[in-house]
């Protein structure tokens, strides 16, 4: 039995117990890839790692693993790779690049600088709506894709790169660098301007720099699975 991990949907990062920073990823592409795998293969298990609101497949061969935030995603991905023999890892999830380090205000920052004192931060479970000039100080999140081959060198890794409003040449160059840096076996490159309604143009790039163009999510799923099968 082959085991797949598919990460899907968007990640939210907490500001306080009520508010979050998030993105608009629905998880539709991850679900489409999962459904195509389920239709084309019988002896598989899919670990579908997703956010609470992500679209998801419904099938007894799919194990749903919900995550809250990038650090939770990191813990659950590492646990999967350490405790299961994962044959394929398809990382479609839109992971946040930054998380909140602390929250303060401009006045508190000025006071800290003028007095050469520690920064006064807001630690309320719900920040008051009467606070003025809020400042969110962000810090980088861990890069999940860089963990995969370190934890499981033999796992077949598919990465995804999304840019906005760039040329095809630049898109493919950036995606290729992502592939090489993280030892991906395939990388899917797409531009936000090419994703609308039922259209979803993408370029699938293999380790030999062969580029296969896809026109929508179903086409991406079909061609991606075919390329994965041909290389294993």
Where are the regions a protein language model picked out?
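A cross-family phosphate/adenosyl-ligand binding-site feature
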Residues: 1-232
């Amino acid at each position: 039995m082959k085991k797949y991990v598919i990460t899907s949907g968007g990640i939210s990062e907490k500001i306080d117990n009520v508010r979050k920073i998030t993105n608009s990823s629905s998880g539709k592409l991850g679900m489409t890839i999962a459904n195509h795998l389920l239709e084309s293969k019988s002896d598989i298990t899919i670990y579908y790692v997703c956010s609470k609101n992500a679209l998801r497949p419904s099938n007894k061969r799919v194990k749903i693993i919900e995550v809250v935030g990038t650090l939770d995603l990191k813990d659950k991905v590492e646990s999967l790779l350490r405790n299961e023999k994962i044959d394929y890892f398809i990382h479609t999830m839109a992971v946040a690049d930054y998380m909140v380090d602390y929250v303060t205000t401009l006045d508190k920052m000025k006071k800290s600088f003028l007095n050469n004192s520690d920064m006064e931060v807001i630690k309320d479970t719900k920040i008051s709506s009467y606070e003025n000039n809020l400042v969110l100080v962000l810090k980088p999140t861990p890069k999940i894709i860089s963990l995969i081959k370190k934890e499981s060198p033999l796992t077949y890794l598919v990465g995804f790169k999304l840019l906005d409003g760039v040329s095809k040449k630049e898109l493919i160059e950036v995606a290729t660098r992502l592939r090489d840096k993280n030892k991906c076996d395939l990388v899917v490159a797409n531009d936000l301007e090419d994703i609308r309604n039922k259209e979803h143009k993408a370029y699938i790039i293999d380790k030999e720099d062969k580029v296969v163009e896809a026109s929508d999510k179903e086409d991406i799923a079909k061609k991606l699975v075919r390329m994965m099968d041909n290389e294993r």
